[in-house]
Amino acid sequence: DCIINADLYDCLDFIPDGWFNLIVVDPPYNLDKYFHGHRFSSMTENDYENYLRSWFYKICDKLAPNGSLYMCGDWKCSSSMQRVIEERLAIINRITWQREKGRGAKSNWKNAMEDIWFAVKNPNDYYFDVEAVKMKRKVRAPYRVDGKPKDWAETDSGKFRLTYPSNFWDDISIPFWS
């Protein structure tokens, strides 16, 4: 296993093609932003898509034949991300993450969600361990068969079932200092 936390442009040429089983990328959103001494300026949608292509195609080459990729984006750049991802990978799903952070807006809705695109190199051969990501949920309608719980368990802390995860995430929060 290997985690690389580096500037993409500094390390990409040193990574062999087909190396990664999983890539998680959180590129600059198409906003005017100053972050840790670096400035990113918003651009036209076409220019932003070309910016994404300038490194995304190379990332796809680094993905293993059965590899997966997750790409994060806000609502303004999400459609550009989708178009660029579809040029090289198969999109399996779009996860909507409801986040607690977000700035209020006096003349608009507060932006408190982000998209996380889940894409793979080969839609017929990729790894997804659904058992590892099942959710423990409180049972609201405790069905029984022959007096025994059907698809749920009764514990000291209540009635729960393990259920398949959805593409709406509202149970993950990021500390305010991040």
Where are the predicted features?
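Core catalytic lobe of class I
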Residues: D1-S178
